């Protein structure tokens, strides 16, 4: 649709606004949000009917979680539908970065969907084999990184440093795959409480929409002395759709949640954030902006690793949001405080664009 309206600009001057990334980003945000908001109730009703008992609740989890039994999962289907429809309406479909990002998002979403499907149908906490799932994720990430390498550089930009890049050479592929897969699974681990994951995802998406826009604009990139990557500005439109869909989803995911995002949504959105960070050369900044996801992910790694070594636990329960629940925080306290942390970390991450 964007290209159609742009072609009319010679006859209708006002239509030229469709060429602007900023306008299309806002339009994509509104479109995806409206789609999720309008179609959400029917999707939730359909999923609830098909899933019966809904997502299994962890037996060792906080007692307050047992009242969530019967809540349907796979809410990521709502989010992805809103994003994809909006993106096809407002994005430049000839942009390679758009297609690579869409490939990662939908591929990770399919893996998450299969995982959710197994959990719901078998009523077990264990879904897709961990090794098989990670293998597929790394394969997808390597393919995406290889495509990016063909159209860009293998350089790694450092925050707070002007015009200095580390040439990763062949190591770019495994490094990029680690960023993409790591982000996808970190977001997945964060999604454990009503509304907990979607707001930090929106905060990170909005932050990277700005980064993508600046990195893809040669004038802004030169002024800020950040790596210029031609074409990445289009990712701002895609991320705008993510923010809008996230807002629409939050309407239904706010406590008490009518639906859970599930692996379908968390893996897809995390993978998307990872590939955007790689494309814009802001992988390290992602660790700052998405610091909450890093914290959640490392809490699990530390818990599992320490238990294998010492047969003891560092946290009362992992991921770390459950630790604070066990300490006596209410679910709302954990969620809102973690939201605050994600916003503060995003501001710190964005400050690296200027502090050089």
UniProtKB/Swiss-Prot annotation:
Entry keyword set: Cell cycle, Cell division, Cell inner membrane, Cell membrane, Cell shape, Cell wall biogenesis/degradation, Magnesium, Membrane, Metal-binding, Peptidoglycan synthesis, Transferase, Transmembrane, Transmembrane helix
InterPro entries: Glycosyl_transferase_4, PNAcMuramoyl-5peptid_Trfase, PNAcMuramoyl-5peptid_Trfase_CS
GO biological process, one term: peptidoglycan biosynthetic process
Cofactors demanded by this protein: Mg(2+)
Primary localization: membrane
EC number: 2.7.8.13
MF term (GO), any: phospho-N-acetylmuramoyl-pentapeptide-transferase activity
Swiss-Prot/TrEMBL catalytic activity: UDP-N-acetyl-alpha-D-muramoyl-L-alanyl-gamma-D-glutamyl-meso-2,6-diaminopimeloyl-D-alanyl-D-alanine + di-trans,octa-cis-undecaprenyl phosphate = di-trans,octa-cis-undecaprenyl diphospho-N-acetyl-alpha-D-muramoyl-L-alanyl-D-glutamyl-meso-2,6-diaminopimeloyl-D-alanyl-D-alanine + UMP
Pathway assigned in UniProt: Cell wall biogenesis; peptidoglycan biosynthesis
Membrane-spanning residues: 25-45, 70-90, 93-113, 138-158, 164-184, 195-215, 235-255, 258-278, 284-304, 333-353
CDD domains listed in its UniProt record: GT_MraY (cd06852)
Function summary: Catalyzes the initial step of the lipid cycle reactions in the biosynthesis of the cell wall peptidoglycan: transfers peptidoglycan precursor phospho-MurNAc-pentapeptide from UDP-MurNAc-pentapeptide onto the lipid carrier undecaprenyl phosphate, yielding undecaprenyl-pyrophosphoryl-MurNAc-pentapeptide, known as lipid I.
Family to which the UniProt record says this protein belongs: Belongs to the glycosyltransferase 4 family. MraY subfamily.
HAMAP family the record matches: MraY
Name assigned to this protein: Phospho-N-acetylmuramoyl-pentapeptide-transferase
